[in-house]
């Protein structure tokens, strides 16, 4: 049994990611990391984030999936964005992505937005959004559309809201009173939280105790704001300051 870090929605915020890594160093031995997508866009350092993940990341990456921003930018499909400023940000990000970044996103990241795997005998699903839509629809407590009963743990991102909850499904298992428990974990966003907490957020799962540590890490937001291009709407700067 081991400890695993769950990281999502970095969004071009290398400063926040580095502080998360500094915090993770102090949490004991970490067997591996689950990455849930949206490494790029909104923030000012998409290329630098990808370079860090590809060349400097100190942990084994067990799961690495596209988020909706990777999908939109790599396929040049901006039709699902809810605002023009979102489209403009994505198109600008696409214009500055390096060949190395494009190669990584094309060849080293799962394009499907979801990944099924096993952790210490537990059946796991990682999905950027949800089974309703792998990229654009989120899981929320009490609103987990889709059938997750085949899994023991479901990791998801996209919403930028951290959560941890359990749901019981009917199952043919008299020993467990015909119930199957599924643990849902959303680590929140490293690079652009929206849950009224401006700190970088991620989670650690201990599969021995099944304890989930929802981490919240301060970082130098002013340093990030100084790096933004004028091509990016100020709205995305304000989200870092307010955490909404």
Predicted regions and their residues:
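Acidic, His/Gly-rich catalytic cores of divalent-metal-dependent hydrolytic chemistry
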Residues: 170-244
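Active-site-proximal loop/helix segment associated with metal-binding centers of metalloenzymes
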Residues: 97, 110, 124, 129-141, ...
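Active-site environment of divalent metal-dependent phosphoester hydrolases
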Residues: 11-16, 41-44, 69-74, 132-134, ...
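Short beta-strand scaffold segments in enzyme catalytic cores
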Residues: 112-117, 162-166, 201-205
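Active-site-proximal segments of metal-dependent phosphoesterases and phosphodiesterases across multiple
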Residues: 81-87, 120-149, 169
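Active-site neighborhood of phospho(di)ester-bond hydrolases with catalytic His/Asp-centered motifs
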Residues: 7-8, 33-37, 63-68, 127, ...
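Core catalytic region of metal-dependent phosphoesterases/phosphodiesterases
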Residues: 2-7, 12-102, 106
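Beta-strand-turn-beta hairpins that frame and shape the catalytic cleft
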Residues: 1-5, 116-125, 178-182
């Amino acid at each position: 049994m081991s400890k695993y870090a769950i990281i999502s929605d970095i969004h071009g915020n290398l400063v926040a990611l580095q502080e998360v890594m500094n915090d993770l160093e102090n949490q004991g031995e970490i067997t591996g990391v689950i990455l849930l997508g949206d490494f790029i866009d909104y923030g000012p350092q998409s290329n630098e984030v990808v370079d860090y993940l590809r060349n400097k990341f100190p942990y084994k990456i067990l799961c690495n999936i596209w988020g909706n921003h990777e999908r939109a930018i790599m396929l040049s499909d901006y039709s699902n964005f809810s605002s023009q400023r979102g489209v403009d940000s994505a198109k600008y990000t696409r214009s500055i992505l390096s060949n190395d970044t494009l190669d990584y996103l094309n060849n080293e990241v799962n394009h499907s937005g979801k990944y099924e795997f096993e952790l210490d005998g537990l059946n796991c699903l990682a999905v950027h959004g949800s089974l309703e839509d792998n990229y654009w629809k989120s899981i929320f407590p009490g609103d987990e559309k889709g059938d997750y009963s085949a899994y023991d743990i479901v990791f998801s991102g996209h919403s930028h809201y951290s959560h941890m909850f359990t749901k019981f499904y009917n199952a043919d298992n008299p020993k467990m009173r015909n119930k199957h428990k599924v643990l849902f974990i959303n680590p929140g966003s490293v690079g652009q939280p929206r849950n009224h907490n401006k700190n970088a957020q991620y989670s650690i799962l201990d599969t021995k105790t099944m304890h989930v540590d929802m981490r919240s890490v301060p970082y130098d937001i002013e340093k990030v704001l100084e790096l933004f291009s004028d091509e990016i709407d100020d709205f995305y700067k304000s989200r870092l300051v307010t955490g909404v």
